[in-house]
Amino acid sequence: MQSRATQHHLTRWVGIAVTTTLAAGLAGCASAEPEAGAAPQTLVLVTHDSFNLSEGVLEKFTSETGITVQVQAAGDAGELVNKLVLTKDSPLGDVVFGIDNTFASRAVNEGVLADYASADLTEAEAEYLLPEGSGREQLTPIDNGDVCINVDHEWFADNNIVEPVTLDDLIKPEYQDLLVVPAANSSSPGLAFLLATIAAYGDDGWQSYWANLVDNGVKISGGWSDAYYVDFSGPSSEGDRPLVVSYASSPPFEVPEGETEAPTGALLDTCFRQTEYAGVIAGTDYPAEAAQLVDFLFSVDVQNDIPESMYVFPVNSAATLPEGWANYAEIADDPYVIEPDDIDANREEWLTQWASIATP
């Protein structure tokens, strides 16, 4: 993975070392479940607006435990964490899903999460764990995906223009007025793209890169839905911009019925790796049952449903991908990453600087 650049040089992210003691370390992540009183009739799952599972999936948890799951949406990943922080003295629910690696450290540092991480993880899922002290003890990885530039192949073929490949290409004159991105201060994919540019160009270079993007006519939309479904020229939209920030897993859902070729694709040299987590909310009256729900979200019953319900990859190595994903949905071999603690320490300053450049 490509880490944050220092003095314009890309370094490589080593990741979390997997040692012979990993299995014990994973088991140690799970806190001892406190004794519970009377089991609840309902658990509240606080999540982002994009949460979706097929009909009947959450009912499997109910059939196993007798507990109904009430889903409460709370905005995107950033809004979700903000609301958890603002209500930590009177928690919104029992379990949270949708905190990603760009906001994990803030949630941990603000004390909104109880010490529980599922013991069901194996060495195969170790790459998705957060560092110790930055969420490993409180957050269980559930899904992941790469936020990348998506390209409308048909548009470029019709206009006889070679498709871009890298971030550097996006500021070239031939791609003027072709890119739309969600705002970094109001969209999780938008923030992920900003972080990709920070990782690529470093503290001294990303601001100039964004100034060049603005000069080259980048359009800033309010959120991912507007960027993808309104401004993008792909088949799901009526827009006129053939380049958009989306996910590497978006192209499979653009394949027309009966066809074998995806009309869009992801530029895998532009990607930022995003992982979403679930955790027990501190202050829940039902910590043991909340822990069961976290384990259920990691279970194959949920993991097999995630790709076609939320358009991202499951992290459970035992999960099965839908037919077609192997052909159209890709994961970048070398995505950009920034350590969660680094994001937490600099996020607000980066967003302030970004806003002064991108939305003057």
How does the language model describe each region?
Residues A30-A32, A36-R106, S236:
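Early extracytoplasmic/lumenal segment of secretory-pathway proteins
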Residues N101-V112, G133-V162, G190-A200, T275-G279:
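Periplasmic solute-binding protein
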Residues Y175-N185, L297-L321:
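Periplasmic-binding protein-like
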Residues P189, L195-D269:
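Ligand-binding pocket segment of bilobal, Venus flytrap-like solute-binding proteins
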